[in-house]
């Protein structure tokens, strides 16, 4: 999303308050060894080679998505322009027969249903999408609903009944909808979206792999492991969405840097979720904070389960928050590279999520018994600010 955003980031031994951080120097070799992660499927492109760092493996997915977009540009579909779309491969509005019109009406209803879900569960983001072109906002709604349904499998009311086989069936549905064979209306909306925009299936599969990790893994030894998990459950969303949101025609950024910045925003959001929900996760027996870093700080699992805020905990949290902000900073450099009609919802999401970190600090780092949130007044202030930032073209944001 920004020309000066490093195309990828490499781990190296540097500490901030006892926390491993990332370096944007691409020429430096990685000195961290990545622990082998044996996911249940064993087929994820991201986890295929355990020798490299998680970041390096995730970058392969970034390259693949960027290549798809470049290929689409060469085929003159013009995804970076806000050209009006009147149909898709799945359903053609121009068909004159009754069956064609019925299909078109059903598709419109499917997208409307997705919009209703987005409006109910992501109100601020939904308002931002209303500034997009009708075609783009409907596609973003469809992606949002699929991601929400996927997350609900392991984090919803029926999560205790979900098995690995259920996730396998969900992945089968994903494959089918990418082949133009949706199971229900929500799937139909996404099937139309992925047939219209150059969206790769891999980030969707990787998100399902993230749900598999949640079923069998509740602790992460290193930040490298946690980074991979954050990519699976949140970074993937950025890779799904950018092909729909589009890149500004005047942008001088490389396609890879646009997707890398989108990935950074997803990682930042998930790290923020983890820091906000420490107490809630602990009550479920889960600790997402890197075990190695906790050990270096002298913090045991029992300490977290007791939930007592001490100077030791405050110092540890300062480092964790600083790292999350680093990811937000990298993402922020690139939002202006998006299509002008797509910037506001992204800016709104970024600014609001950053304020959750501020709220943790305002709570004196008590994320055991207090849930950090952004109040309505601050949200109302953030929305105009997000809108004003969305007006700036790429060349003016450096």
Swiss-Prot record:
Pathway assigned in UniProt: Carotenoid biosynthesis; phytoene biosynthesis; all-trans-phytoene from geranylgeranyl diphosphate: step 1/1
GO cellular component, one term: chloroplast
GO MF: 15-cis-phytoene synthase activity; geranylgeranyl diphosphate synthase activity; squalene synthase [NAD(P)H] activity
Reaction catalyzed: 2 (2E,6E,10E)-geranylgeranyl diphosphate = 15-cis-phytoene + 2 diphosphate
Enzyme class (EC, first level): transferase
Pfam families, per database record: SQS_PSY
One BP annotation, GO: carotenoid biosynthetic process
EC number(s) on file: 2.5.1.32
Protein's cellular compartments: Plastid, Chloroplast
Domain of life: Eukaryota
SUPFAM superfamilies: Terpenoid synthases
Keywords of the record: Carotenoid biosynthesis, Chloroplast, Isoprene biosynthesis, Plastid, Transferase, Transit peptide
InterPro entries, per database record: Isoprenoid_synthase_dom_sf, Squ/phyt_synthse, Squalene/phytoene_synthase_CS, Trans_IPPS_bact-type, Trans_IPPS_HH
Subunit structure: Monomer.
Family label: Belongs to the phytoene/squalene synthase family.
Main function: Catalyzes the reaction from prephytoene diphosphate to phytoene.
PANTHER family tied to this protein: BIFUNCTIONAL LYCOPENE CYCLASE/PHYTOENE SYNTHASE
Protein name: Phytoene synthase, chloroplastic
Organism annotation: Daucus carota (Wild carrot)
Lineage, highest ranks first: Eukaryota, Viridiplantae, Streptophyta, Embryophyta, Tracheophyta
Gene name of the record: PSY
